[in-house]
């Protein structure tokens, strides 16, 4: 920048010198000289040219101009021509130097401007790129939101969710990896055995609680205790009972046993003399109806009915019981009907519903034959036994017939 300033000052100084010379030439004291006029004309010829073209002035043109001046000049002015020629050469060299210096200054200015403008352009370009990136991001977010709202976007989201669930399942499987030795079947069998063992333990606990409750109830029932001691004294064989599992289950239902006890207590008449007692065939008979099957249970009267005096003791070994089952379909709900209650109900029946004498006789004969056959089969299949009776696998696990009739019991599973 300093060189350019000096160059401008030098140009201004040259212009001032030219103006002074022109003013002096127009004055009165002006003297005409050949070399001055020629130098002024040559200066005027060179002044109209551009400063940047001064370096390209051809030496031949300068030489031809000098030769023409010499030829026009007279011989006596040869010395002045030589001086003028030398001045032209000096001015030409000086002007070339100034032009080169100005060119260098211009080149520096151009370079500086290029640097400044380049930096500004780069800044502007960076800002523009940042703005474009921000716009692109905003557009991408808007498009992604639109895609999510469409059906296709929802399907893609479902696929992504399924993939995530699969990965979650794989993670769960990896977390729940089993390090046990053996095949899958062995592990499954072990787990199943554990479950079965837990189930059996629960059943055993339930059975123990039921037995405990049953023992507490049987301890307060004298009739039940006497019947239990009676059956244990007989010691029949476990597997020689002549009953089917259905008959035993029906005869030992606890929910019906309570009703039987209530019916017996309600229908039992006061103690009678020994001569007024009924025969064994006409003993108390209880009919049990369950699932359209009638079961008749006949037993000896209780001890207080057999005793003729307060001091009489009942012999448990002399007692006997028989059970007979008839498969006559019976409609209606499960209930208990005793002969005593039926005799009372007959009083309220109309005459056309009562049985005839022949029908009654047939029923008596059939009843006696059936009871005798049942007793014979029972005595034939009976034997000595110890402990409680166990059922077959097909029998109900909650019924046991080691206890007397009308006693709520449970069955145990068969051992080995």
Curated annotation (Swiss-Prot):
Q: Which segments show compositional bias classed as Low complexity?
A: 317-328
Annotated keywords: Calmodulin-binding, Cell membrane, Cytoplasm, Cytoskeleton, Membrane, Nucleus, Repeat
Q: Name one GO biological process term.
A: cytokinesis, division site positioning
Composition-biased stretches (Polar residues): 388-397
Q: Where is this motif: Nuclear localization signal?
A: 14-21
Record InterPro entries: IQ_motif_EF-hand-BS (IPR000048)
Q: Where is this region: Disordered?
A: 294-367, 388-416
Give every IQ domain span: 83-111, 112-134, 135-158
> PROSITE patterns under this entry?
IQ
Reading the lineage from the top rank, the first entry is: Eukaryota
MF term (GO), any: calmodulin binding
Pfam families named among the record's database cross-references: IQ (PF00612)
Q: Where mainly located? A: nucleus
- Region Calmodulin-binding, residue ranges: 116-146
Compartment list? Nucleus; Nucleus, Nuclear body; Cytoplasm, Cytoskeleton; Cell membrane
CDD domains documented for this protein: IQCD
Q: Looking at the UniProt record for this protein, which Gene Ontology cellular component terms does it annotate, in alphabetical order?
A: nuclear body; nucleus; phragmoplast; plasma membrane; preprophase band
**Biological role stated in the UniProt entry:** May be involved in cooperative interactions with calmodulins or calmodulin-like proteins. Recruits calmodulin proteins to microtubules, thus being a potential scaffold in cellular signaling and trafficking. May associate with nucleic acids and regulate gene expression at the transcriptional or post-transcriptional level.
Can you tell me which family this protein belongs to? Belongs to the IQD family.
Q: How does the record describe its quaternary structure?
A: Binds to multiple calmodulin (CaM) in the presence of Ca(2+) and CaM-like proteins.
Q: What's this protein's name?
A: Protein IQ-DOMAIN 6
């Amino acid at each position: 920048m300093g060189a350019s300033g000096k160059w401008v000052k030098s140009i201004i100084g040259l212009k001032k010198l030219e103006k002074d010379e022109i003013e002096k030439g127009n004055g009165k004291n002006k003297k005409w000289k050949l070399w001055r006029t020629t130098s002024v004309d040559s200066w005027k010829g060179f002044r109209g040219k551009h400063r940047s073209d001064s370096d390209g002035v051809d030496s031949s043109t300068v030489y031809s101009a000098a030769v023409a001046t010499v030829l026009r000049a007279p011989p006596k002015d040869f010395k002045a021509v030589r001086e003028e020629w030398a001045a032209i050469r000096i001015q030409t060299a000086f002007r070339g130097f100034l032009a080169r210096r100005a060119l260098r200054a211009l080149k520096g200015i151009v370079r500086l401007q290029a640097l400044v403008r380049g930096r500004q352009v780069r800044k502007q370009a960076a800002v523009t790129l940042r703005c474009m990136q921000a716009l692109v991001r905003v557009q991408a977010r808007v498009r992604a939101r639109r895609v999510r709202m469409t059906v296709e976007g929802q399907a893609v989201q479902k696929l992504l969710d399924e993939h995530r669930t699969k990965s979650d399942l794989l993670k769960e499987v990896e977390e729940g990896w089993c390090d046990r030795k053996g095949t899958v079947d062995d592990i499954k069998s072990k787990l199943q055995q554990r479950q079965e063992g837990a189930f059996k333990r629960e059943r055993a606990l339930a059975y123990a609680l039921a037995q405990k409750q049953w023992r507490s109830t049987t301890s307060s029932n004298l009739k039940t205790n006497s019947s239990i001691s009676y059956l244990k004294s007989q010691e029949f064989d476990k597997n020689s009972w002549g009953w089917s599992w259905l008959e035993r289950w029906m005869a030992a239902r606890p929910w019906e046993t309570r009703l039987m006890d209530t019916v017996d207590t309600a229908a039992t008449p006061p103690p009678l003399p020994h001569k007024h007692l009924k025969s064994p065939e006409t003993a108390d008979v209880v009919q049990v109806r369950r699932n359209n099957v009638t079961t008749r249970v006949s037993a000896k009267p209780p001890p207080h009915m057999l005793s003729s005096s307060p001091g009489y003791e009942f012999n448990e070994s002399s007692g006997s019981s028989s059970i007979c089952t008839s498969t006559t379909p019976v409609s209606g709900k499960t209930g208990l009907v005793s002969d005593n209650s039926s005799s009372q109900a007959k009083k309220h029946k109309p005459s056309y519903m009562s049985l005839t004498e022949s029908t009654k006789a047939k029923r008596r004969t059939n009843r006696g034959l059936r009871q005798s056959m049942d007793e014979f089969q029972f005595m034939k299949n009976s034997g000595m036994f110890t402990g409680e009776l166990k059922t077959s696998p097909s029998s109900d696990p909650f019924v046991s017939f080691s206890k007397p009739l009308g006693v709520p019991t449970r069955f145990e599973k068969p051992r080995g």
